[in-house]
């Protein structure tokens, strides 16, 4: 499951660029608001909210913004009601796509999703058409400079480690059951081991390996989704061949 890190490496680099976009805080505020609405405003008893707050802090969101988002979720402040809707479909070369959205206008969002698909050689599928290809997991990245593979295995197995991706030259990818992600984070915190990008992820059971031309088309499609304010996250079973990596990095 975790041996496919070339697309993960590109996603990590893309995230640095995405952080410069004005839509990042909008997406983070939505997630905090939704999490607070669903599970209450106390992060100690709401793992989804706790993770959302941690992500916001990691991206330098001011605490005032975080608190306002929480209060909008709990109803203490007036705010927009967000509906979470997940779309499924296929992109170039038959790769599977899951698009998670949070919207205040369902008709606008589905029209936007269809438009983006049609302009980028994709097609919208029925609910359940590709979801069975993915597993929901907790993931985070540990820089190789922070810990060794044996050290992480020994430390995290009892905390709930399921898999440790080691193909990336700069990071280990820790994969856990969703319910164990907080335990794994605490184990790393207690050991003073730095980590990044802790999140709930959708990981494909199997990957479709693409060459550079098709990979570029898929990345263009994903970029179009991620530039839409209603889209919170995009998942795919694309993997990029070794021969395509050098071309994509040019």
UniProtKB/Swiss-Prot annotation:
Keyword Transmembrane recorded: no
A GO cellular component annotation in the UniProt record: cytosol
Classification via Pfam families: TACO1_YebC_N, Transcrip_reg
InterPro entries: Integrase-like_N, TACO1_YebC-like_2nd/3rd_dom, TACO1_YebC_N, Transcrip_reg_TACO1-like, Transcrip_reg_TACO1-like_dom3, YebC-like
Gene Ontology biological process terms in this record: regulation of DNA-templated transcription
Subcellular localization, as worded in the UniProt entry: Cytoplasm
Keyword set, alphabetical order: Cytoplasm, DNA-binding, Transcription, Transcription regulation
PANTHER family: TRANSCRIPTIONAL REGULATORY PROTEIN YEBC-RELATED (PTHR12532:SF6), TRANSLATIONAL ACTIVATOR OF CYTOCHROME C OXIDASE 1 (PTHR12532)
HAMAP family (alphabetical): Transcrip_reg_TACO1
Family listed: Belongs to the TACO1 family.
The name this protein goes by in its record: Probable transcriptional regulatory protein Ppha_0657
Species this protein is from: Pelodictyon phaeoclathratiforme (strain DSM 5477 / BU-1)
């Amino acid at each position: 499951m975790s041996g496919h890190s070339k697309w993960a490496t590109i996603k990590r680099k893309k995230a640095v660029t995405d952080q410069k976009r004005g839509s990042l805080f909008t997406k983070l505020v939505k997630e905090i608001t939704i999490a607070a609405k669903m599970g209450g405003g106390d992060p100690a008893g709401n793992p989804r909210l706790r993770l959302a707050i941690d992500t916001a802090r990691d991206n330098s969101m001011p605490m005032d913004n975080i608190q306002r988002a929480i209060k909008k979720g709990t109803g203490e402040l007036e705010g927009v009601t967000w509906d979470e809707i997940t779309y499924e479909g296929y992109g170039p070369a038959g790769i599977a796509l899951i698009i998670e959205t949070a919207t205040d206008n369902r008709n606008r969002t589905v029209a936007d999703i269809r438009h983006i698909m049609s302009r980028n050689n994709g097609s919208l599928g029925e609910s359940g058409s590709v979801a069975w290809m993915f597993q929901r997991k907790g993931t985070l990245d540990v820089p190789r400079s922070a810990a060794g593979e044996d050290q992480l295995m020994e430390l995290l197995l009892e905390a709930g480690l399921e898999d440790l991706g080691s193909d990336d030259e700069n990071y280990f990818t820790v994969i856990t059951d969703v319910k164990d992600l907080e335990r794994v984070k605490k184990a790393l915190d207690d050991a003073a081991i730095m980590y990044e990008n802790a999140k709930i992820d959708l990981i494909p059971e199997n990957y479709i390996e693409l060459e550079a031309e098709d990979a570029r088309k898929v990345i263009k499609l994903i970029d179009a989704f991620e530039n839409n304010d209603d889209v919170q996250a995009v998942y795919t079973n694309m993997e990029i061949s070794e021969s395509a990596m050098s071309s994509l990095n040019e």
